Amino acid sequence: MSKRDIVLTNVTVVQLLRQPCPVTRAPPPPEPKAEVEPQPQPEPTPVREEIKPPPPPLPPHPATPPPKMVSVARELTVGINGFGRIGRLVLRACMEKGVKVVAVNDPFIDPEYMVYMFKYDSTHGRYKGSVEFRNGQLVVDNHEISVYQCKEPKQIPWRAVGSPYVVESTGVYLSIQAASDHISAGAQRVVISAPSPDAPMFVMGVNENDYNPGSMNIVSNASCTTNCLAPLAKVIHERFGIVEGLMTTVHSYTATQKTVDGPSRKAWRDGRGAHQNIIPASTGAAKAVTKVIPELKGKLTGMAFRVPTPDVSVVDLTCRLAQPAPYSAIKEAVKAAAKGPMAGILAYTEDEVVSTDFLGDTHSSIFDAKAGIALNDNFVKLISWYDNEYGYSHRVVDLLRYMFSRDK
């Protein structure tokens, strides 16, 4: 508006009236008095002025202390590229662990659909918190998360959200060269949620101490199966020695498989219906263990069976031991590790369990003491369960937190 609004306020004017001036009257003349002879007055005693001592000097004003420097605590912030099974569960794990997610990128999922897919999960159930799309952002438990739909990592504005640590969970950008576009776009570090052909590979509880902040800004969290096998193999090898071994994972079907028979160029039987078949498949998990435990190079290999279950898988490690040991000694060694240095990573159970008992379990590997067997003191079969989705996603977040702690 070009004119100002004028607000009129009623003002009461009070008129002050002066009191009329009093009339001055002359006093009556005094009556005459008899003359009295004046009496001599005593001389006044001189009054000595008391001299007060000067007040003590004021103490010097204390110097103002310099202002204290308030250090701002660094905070781990995370960006997620790829909002598929692992991407969404990494976000859930971050919310559970109090890790701040600042951005999600997925060119194939509309923001409103992100809300739906994150809120409802056929395997892990409905998200217990609040989730909505508001003011152009994904809002989870009142935490605002920027949403992007960039097709290439170099297009994602990571700098605009504070240069977070990025989880590369598309399954596409697996090499250092491909993932380096995240760094160019402003990401501080990148964790690939899959095996990588050339990025340093880490398994929490096994070799995370080898992480070098000065030279490693792109790393791999290996595979879910490697995260299950490696902690168990580490305990057995360090205590008894593994001469050689074969690993088999009985693995739930994944999104890359077919619901009904379809084409598969890489391996023909991979294209058969996932819900109808037990499908032999290849896996690099056993060989990947040799990257995190170099002493086992050339001693392990393995394969997989894809089975018609939606989640939770199990590793069968059959190996020959260098030091003879009864099965009871193996159980005690694993139990001690689960209670000690590998707590939270490796677990131990003697219950009569089945696969669904581990749905939502956040451990990397749960040793089933009653399922294993020994042929003799040198040749054993060891069984360990894992939630190949949820447990793995928690390890991704744990690796992010560990890297952040080392980067300080």
Swiss-Prot record:
Cellular component per GO, a single term: nucleus
Superkingdom of origin organism: Eukaryota
Catalytic activity: D-glyceraldehyde 3-phosphate + phosphate + NAD(+) = (2R)-3-phospho-glyceroyl phosphate + NADH + H(+)
SMART domains per record: Gp_dh_N (SM00846)
Protein's cellular compartments: Cytoplasm
Residues the record lists as binding D-glyceraldehyde 3-phosphate: 223-225, 254, 283-284, 306
InterPro entries, alphabetized: GlycerAld/Erythrose_P_DH, GlycerAld_3-P_DH_AS, GlycerAld_3-P_DH_cat, GlycerAld_3-P_DH_NAD(P)-bd, Glyceraldehyde-3-P_DH_1, NAD(P)-bd_dom_sf
EC numbers: 1.2.1.12
Family: Belongs to the glyceraldehyde-3-phosphate dehydrogenase family.
Subunit structure: Homotetramer. Interacts with ARRB2; the interaction is detected in the nucleus upon OR1D2 stimulation.
Name by which UniProt lists this protein: Glyceraldehyde-3-phosphate dehydrogenase, testis-specific
Native organism: Homo sapiens (Human)
Highest classification ranks of the organism: Eukaryota, Metazoa, Chordata, Craniata, Vertebrata
